[in-house]
A protein has these predicted regions:
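Intrinsically disordered, low-complexity, charged terminal extensions of DNA damage-control enzymes
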Residues: 1-17, 23, 184-352
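Catalytic cores of DNA base-excision repair glycosylases
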Residues: 2-7, 11-195, 199-212, 223, ...
Length: 352
């Protein structure tokens, strides 16, 4: 077991990624990086991290910010509940006087699970908590030949126990960073570099030729299709947006008027629909233009098929009164989803 951790740490010192959150013991900065990387690859999250901590350098700066601004800095990272949870947790910490210094306190933060708490506490405070993420599942299942499904209750308990047994308690932060980078760079999901792996002489998966089938998952996520019809209103120098609410995707992000349907609609169906007529509210008949049809946007459990429309109305029109009227020049100030941002780019930068 000691040989396992030593080989991983030796490999990491030679091959590990040089990342800004690895060069600090500041729990706040580590927390921000871990939340960003929960559902985002390092190469995508790096610039977001730099911008986010430049604007919100500590708990108190983040707590004092308006939620709309926090969401704007998160725009493009997806999984926006992470940003809302960050903001809520920062406000609780600011009230309490700063970042918690115990595992229990860190684990109690909104949006922080066992993995994230273990990462923060081992990296910032040197506490002996083993991380268990996708990379760790992959490395351990292959090295030990474990075929217990990682998404089963039995599998989760097993991997937590094994990870804890293998943890280097003298250097928990270094070991955790090593095994995560090893999974990300060496023991990859597809085409792992087994030939030059420092563990290849003891890896069960390599010896049995089963690396490609591990780790095992028993359930596949059910994917649902949704159909969006977005309407960009051009009313002189103004347009209309609203903030999404409820527990649906993209909560608290802004978007143009939307009609969601149970299948893809034609232009004629949209134009004649009660929803569109209600938006017009008896105002003038607009000019309607289909900007783009059938744009596919893939989320973790959903596939959205979107049609983008432009509606042109005179500046004194009474239509779309229930929406927030804003200057087109101010549109960039509002946090929107990637899909909506793509729509706005087509409208406002048609030649790009």
């Amino acid at each position: 077991m000691e040989n396992f951790s030593r080989k991983l740490i030796d490999w990491y010192r030679e091959n590990g990624r040089d990342l800004p959150w690895r060069r600090t013991k500041n729990p706040y900065l580590i927390w921000i990086s871990e939340i960003i990387l929960q559902q985002t690859r390092v190469v995508q999250g790096y610039d977001y991290y730099q911008r986010f901590v430049a604007r919100f350098p500590d708990v108190f700066a983040l707590a004092a910010a308006d939620e709309d601004e926090v969401m704007k800095y998160w725009q493009g990272l997806r999984y926006y509940s992470r940003a809302r949870n960050l903001h809520a947790a920062a406000r609780r910490m600011a009230e309490a006087g700063g970042f918690p210094v115990t595992y229990t306190g860190v684990r109690a933060l909104k949006g922080v699970g066992e993995y994230t708490a273990a990462a923060i506490c081992s990296f910032a405070y040197g506490m002996p908590y083993a991380v268990v993420d996708g990379n760790v599942y992959r490395v351990l299942s292959r090295w030990l030949g474990i075929d217990t499904p990682i998404d089963s209750a039995e599998g989760k308990k097993l991997f937590v126990r094994v990870a804890d047994e293998l943890l280097d308690r003298e250097r928990p932060g270094l070991y955790n960073q090593a095994i995560m980078d090893f999974g990300a760079l060496q023991c990859t999901p597809v085409a792992p570099d087994c030939l030059f792996c420092p563990l290849n002489d003891s890896c069960v998966a390599r010896l049995k030729g089963i690396a490609g089938s591990l780790p095992v998952k028993q359930h596949k996520n059910k994917v649902t299709n949704r159909y969006f019809n977005y309407i960009y209103v051009r009313m002189g120098a103004y347009t209309f947006i609203h903030k999404r609410s409820g527990n649906d995707i993209w909560k608290n992000l802004y978007e143009p008027p939307l009609i969601e349907t149970d299948r893809e609609w034609t232009e004629e169906e949209l134009y004649a629909s009660p929803q569109f007529r209600e938006m017009l509210a008896g105002g003038e008949e607009p000019i309607v233009r289909l900007v783009r049809k059938g744009v596919k946007h893939v989320l973790s459990h959903r596939v959205i098929y979107a049609n983008f429309y432009e509606v042109i109305l005179p500046e004194n029109s009474a239509s779309f009164a229930k929406y927030q009227r804003i200057s087109v020049e101010d549109l960039h100030k509002f946090a929107v989803s990637r899909l909506v941002n793509q729509f706005f780019s087509l409208i406002l930068e048609p030649n790009n």
